[in-house]
Regions:
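C-terminal subregions of glycosyltransferases and related glycan-biosynthesis enzymes
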Residues: 49-150
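Conserved nucleotide-sugar donor-binding catalytic segment
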Residues: 1-67
């Protein structure tokens, strides 16, 4: 859910058809245009994930699109939709997608273990996560870096 000035949406010409990453693409384009983006420190929307959710069924593909968009952003460039599609097509395969999805399960299980104070299970899921997918570890690393430097 977004709150923003109409002029921001107009100048950016709204959302683009960037598969699986429309919000992320919009946010980085806004930053490149000099707008400030921020999060509220309170929950205003609860989102329920289901196994059929597009965010889950295409999780690795979404990660790849995000990587490409970020790579272009780090060069202070707006990602081309066509180039992003070609990048994903080149790097996506079912073996890595399955590993990534499995790593996501271990990660979420580990988070639940912390919440439930199941520390032995947390260690087990954490260790399994370490060896499940190098791409998922990269996602965690990127998240930590953004959190530290934001």
């Amino acid at each position: 859910t977004w709150f923003g000035k109409k002029e921001v949406f107009e100048q950016l010409e709204g959302y683009r058809q960037m598969p699986l990453c429309e919000d992320y693409d919009f946010t980085l384009r806004a930053i490149l245009k000099g707008y400030k983006i921020s999060n509220l420190n309170e929950v205003v929307l609860k989102y329920r994930m289901t196994s059929d959710s597009i965010s889950r069924s295409n999780l690795f593909e979404q990660y790849l699109y995000g990587c490409y968009i970020t790579k272009q952003y780090s060069k202070k460039q707006i990602a081309s939709i066509e180039d992003a599609h070609n990048y994903v097509k080149e790097h996506n395969n079912s073996k890595n997608a399955k590993k990534y999805l499995k790593a996501n399960k271990y990660f979420n299980d580990a988070l639940n273990d912390i919440e439930n104070k199941s520390f032995i299970s947390f260690i087990k899921n954490g260790l399994l996560l370490l060896f499940a997918s190098k791409y998922y570890l990269n996602k965690i690393y990127r998240f930590v870096m953004v959190t530290l430097y934001s």
